[in-house]
From Swiss-Prot:
Pfam families: DUF2418. GO terms for biological process: maintenance of rDNA; regulation of exit from mitosis. The keyword Transmembrane helix applies. This is Nuclear rim protein 1. Keywords: Membrane, Nucleus, Transmembrane, Transmembrane helix. Residues 448-465 have a biased composition (Polar residues). Residues 438-526, 559-589 are annotated as: Disordered. Member of a perinuclear network that controls recombination at multiple loci to maintain genome stability. Required for rDNA repeat stability. Residues 560-572 have a biased composition (Low complexity). The chain crosses the membrane at residues 170-190, 261-281. It is found in: Nucleus membrane. The lineage of its organism: Eukaryota, Fungi, Dikarya, Ascomycota, Saccharomycotina.
Length: 589
């Protein structure tokens, strides 16, 4: 953990720091000051002085501690060791040493102690003549009162007696150690898992059914799968309390998984009980060393190498499956890119929109805290540097807005207009009138010509949405209303559409009139075009009734039946009943 930091005044700079106690935005203190004290002490103490001080402090602490404190210290140091990493470096040599030590004990017992057993255990002091005054009066028994010469002459027998006692102690100690190791390996390490969401019972021999309401309930099946002492206790002492297994609506399954540690497995494989009990109940010679070595190697290969490697391979496969599921299913669903935005929602807004990094979501990985001064601290953990970084605060956007293909073509072909035009509808609204309805140039809702006056203003409010046309033919002439930027001739489109409005198909018929009234006259002229950029020719004006009849000249095969029926359809007489004579419209077809 780093030392005390003094952060820079520029908030844009990223400052590497750890999770710390923040006094203010520019001042932090580490949560664990022991590392800081250790680093600061290096400036005042040398390595030798620090070493002596540490040992002296440890010795003083050891002398002033109670026995229970010593027990806690030893237990904590023992549990803090990662024994699984020492399976091959410590457990295997230790188990092999114990196996060959037991072989040596049995070899000495069968070949050294057993032939001299009658000399070691014979009764040398059947009668003590020195304790009887009557026997001491006879000269014949006086020679048996001095036994010092006999004891010094039989030193070999005394040595064998001491060796026999030592071998018996080692024999019992190794047998007990192997028995405890076998019991711990087979019955000492289990983990219990509760399955609350399994509708069907899994196929497992270690599965028991538990009740959610009565925690003391144990079925007969559960008792039969317990230990021998549990079975005896329930059979003779608590037989009446054992209930039959009854199906209930609310229950769960419990699996008792056998999981010995790798260190214990390696010790069991290198000090197997089969080899120990084989040597305990058979006469041992040097030839017996061959089956002992073979048994030990076979146990190590089957139990530790094959079985442990199989578990590691299965874990690797499961991790690969989980990683594939995470990358293909979970990440696309749960890691959607988000972005915070601030948009002006007033009726007279000026298209104000601003984007911010998505810090409000739970998946952003940003830790937001407050200092003692009330400053908001935003920190994010950097996997590359393995440290926390201060996130710069500001109003600028950190995300990239990606446009679609049509939008990229539109922005690259047409110049950007600062005024807002949505779906091709240019809207004129007085900001002070709070009128949200669009104002078009045509009387019947048809948008006006693309040549707008310089004094016309546009509104930032949204226009009515209408479906975009999709070009179904890559033909030079685009007959859609306003063209289609995804296909067609862009040269003709850009030459006619000077204002760069996006393509839009309006809901009005192309045969509706575009009526322009002049001052002091009732004459109107009807437009049969919709300002398409691909009009090739126009007809002459009808001079009698002062109407303009605009038609589209194009190959007949290029138009669909729906387009022909739309462009060649007749006008209802009711539409022109209030605008003059019906004879001014084109003939019916």
């Amino acid at each position: 953990m780093p030392k005390h930091h003094t952060f820079a005044t520029k908030l844009e700079d990223l400052v590497l720091t750890s999770m710390s106690f923040r006094m203010s935005k520019h001042q932090a203190h580490p949560i664990e000051p022991e590392d800081v004290i250790r680093e600061e002490s290096e400036d005042f103490y040398s390595d030798e002085e620090e070493y002596k001080e540490t040992w002296s402090r440890w010795a003083l602490q050891l002398l002033s501690s109670s026995p229970y404190d010593l027990y806690l210290i030893v237990n904590e140091n023992f549990e803090s060791i990662n024994w699984d990493l020492k399976a091959k470096t410590l457990a295997r040599p230790l188990g092999g040493t114990m196996t060959f030590l037991f072989f040596t004990v049995r070899l000495l017992q069968d070949n050294v102690i057993k032939p001299n057993y009658h000399k070691i255990n014979r009764t040398t002091d059947g009668f003590d003549f020195s304790r009887s005054a009557t026997l001491r009066e006879y000269d014949y028994f006086s020679k048996y009162q001095h036994g010092a010469s006999w004891s010094s002459a039989n030193w070999r027998v005394n040595s064998l007696s001491i060796l026999d006692t030592l071998l018996k102690c080692l024999y019992i100690l190794l047998l007990v150690s192997n028995s405890v190791l076998t019991y711990k390996f087979l019955f000492g390490y289990f983990l219990k898992y509760s399955l609350f969401h399994s509708a069907q019972p899994p196929a497992s021999n270690n599965l028991t059914k538990k009740s959610l309401h009565d925690l003391a309930y144990r079925s007969a099946t559960d008792v039969s799968r317990g230990s021998l002492w549990t079975l005896i206790r329930y059979t003779f002492f608590q037989r009446g309390r054992v209930q039959e297994e009854k199906p209930t609506d609310e229950f769960y399954y419990e699996i008792k998984k056998w999981c010995p540690s790798s260190f214990l497995t390696a010790l069991f494989a290198s000090f197997p009980p089969i080899s120990v009990w084989f040597m305990a109940f058979s006469d041992i010679t040097f030839v017996s060393l061959l089956p002992v070595i073979l048994t030990q190697y076979l146990f190590w290969y089957v139990i530790f190498d094959c079985y442990e490697d199989r578990i590691k391979d299965e874990l690797a496969i499961f991790k690969g499956m989980a990683a594939e599921y995470n990358n293909k299913v979970m990440k696309p669903k749960l890691s959607a890119q988000t972005q915070d935005a601030m948009v002006d929602a007033t009726m007279y807004g000026q298209e104000f929109v601003q984007f911010y990094p998505s810090y409000s979501t739970a998946r952003s990985g940003v830790f937001i805290t407050h200092s003692l001064c009330g400053d908001v601290i935003k920190e994010k953990y950097n996997q590359r540097t393995k440290a926390f970084e201060d996130i710069p605060t500001g109003s600028h956007s950190q995300n990239i807005i990606r446009y679609s293909r049509n939008e990229r073509l539109y922005h690259s072909v047409f110049p950007q207009n600062p005024l807002k035009k949505i779906n091709g509808a240019a809207m004129s609204v007085n900001p002070m009138s709070f009128n949200r309805s669009p104002t078009y140039g045509g009387r019947y809702g048809t948008p006006p010509s693309r040549s707008h006056g310089s004094g016309q203003t546009y509104s930032s409010t949204s226009a009515p949405t209408s479906p975009m046309l999709k070009n179904r033919r890559a033909i030079p002439t685009d007959h859609s209303t306003g063209g289609n930027i995804s296909g067609g001739n862009y040269v003709e489109y850009t030459s006619n559409d000077v204002h760069g409005e996006p393509p839009r198909r309006h809901s009005t018929s192309p045969l509706k009139r575009d009526i322009t009234s002049s001052a002091g006259r009732e004459d109107n002229h009807l437009a049969f075009g919709v300002n398409s950029p691909n009009i090739r020719s126009r007809t002459v004006d009808v001079k009698k009734n002062l109407h303009t009849h605009t038609t589209v000249v194009c190959p007949k095969s290029d138009l669909d039946t729906s387009q022909l029926s739309s462009k060649q359809s007749s006008i209802s007489p009711f539409k022109l009943s209030r605008r003059g004579s019906i004879e001014s419209r084109p003939p019916f077809r």
